[in-house]
Amino acid sequence: MIKLHRQSYKNLQNISTASPSRVCKSARGKTSTAQKSHVNKGALSCDVHPHQAQELVSQQVELLHVLHRNDEMWRLAVQDTTKHIQSAEKKASRFSRRKQTAPPKTKSLRTPPACSTDKQNAPTVPASPSSYETLGCREQRPENPKDEATLPLTAHNIPKKAPSLLEKIGLKLKRTVEYIGASNCAFEDD
């Protein structure tokens, strides 16, 4: 069972996960508990401003930028990973000093699990908040209502060549509703 601890500070959330010790069975049939516990630490930033998360970057945690809207969550690309890459290069150089025949291995960066099950990657989310007005962490709406797509529901302003959406729906309903008739084959002669 994995435990998830969360701490909040303004618009940042610290998340750390810890998996409990595992129970192993030896060859003799005795059960022994392994004293290994795995701990991941991470930080979630609720908006796209990277300068607000500088306090957590100085610590040894991985930083995730996450956009929340209702119950959905989008993970954004990590922008500042220089400390993690430098620490991975140092570990690789130490390993290559010990064994000079083997090539240095690059360590892959792991990300902590997100706290929502509806996790989606969003590579096309804009990095600057210029087009959206942020209301807390959960809601985002366009600044200009003209930017939203509109579809006319009535045909007052549209020429008669193009039927409106309601007319299309009405035409489809009229086409599908037909009287087939009823027959009872039990009383007919063969």
Curated annotation (Swiss-Prot):
Residues 136-149 have a biased composition (Basic and acidic residues). InterPro entries: Vexin. Keywords: Cell membrane, Membrane, Neurogenesis, Nucleus. It comes from the Eukaryota. GO terms for biological process: neurogenesis; neuron differentiation. Expressed in differentiating progenitors in the developing central nervous system (CNS). It is found in: Cell membrane; Nucleus. Residues 117-133 have a biased composition (Polar residues). Residues 88-156 are annotated as: Disordered. GO terms for cellular component: nucleus; plasma membrane. Disruption phenotype: Morpholino knockdown of the protein causes inhibition of primary neurogenesis. Belongs to the vexin family. Required for neurogenesis in the neural plate and retina. Cooperates with cell cycle inhibitor cdknx/p27(xic1) to enhance neurogenesis and increase the levels of the neuronal determination factor neurog2/X-ngngr-1. This is Vexin. The lineage of its organism: Eukaryota, Metazoa, Chordata, Craniata, Vertebrata.
